[in-house]
Amino acid sequence: NRVSGLNSRQFTKYWKVESESPDYKVTFQGDTAEIVSPKGLTLWRKEKMSGKVTIEYDACVVVESDGDRLSDLNCFWMASDPQYPDNLWKREKWRSGIFLNCYSLQLYYLGYGGNHNSTTRFRRYDGDESGITNPKARPAILKEYTDAGHLLKPNHWYHIKITNENNRVSYYIDGERLVDFRDAEPLREGWFGFRTTLSRTRITNFSYE
């Protein structure tokens, strides 16, 4: 679907905000959405994706004033709730954008510039809810970068490309492949979510096929 839907006219048709704080804001300039997230927030694309998938979008973390924090240009993909595989929204109110509650989902997760822009990490979540309260049950880090070249630059527009093909999962940022993961039990369907926390971000040019 080449319709990005990141404008005021189409936004609610294609996207759904799941936010820990009721005080989040989404504003639009043309086909670019700006998200101010005081706490954890997932911007879910409403369509379920399946099979061979390529997702692309442009995004940046805005740092222009005192309250802006350079951190967390993250995303979920092939996300689903094992308890309700065909309905991601069934427990949306319970998840409520809270990061810990996302351990209840199966998904691939890339956190770019997480932990106050000190880490970039890739994980595969298996939907084990015990991870919500038990750190030892949380999914392993499958790939990690901590060097400055793989952390966020302020106000820089990144081009992100994600591919899922058979059992191979790849994540590219500005043309560099950060993740090349072969999954013994690949997640073949699910939803995409743009994820951030305590930040001001912009996203545009979203497409998938």
Each model region followed by its residue ranges:
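Extracellular glycan-recognition regions
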Residues: 1-209
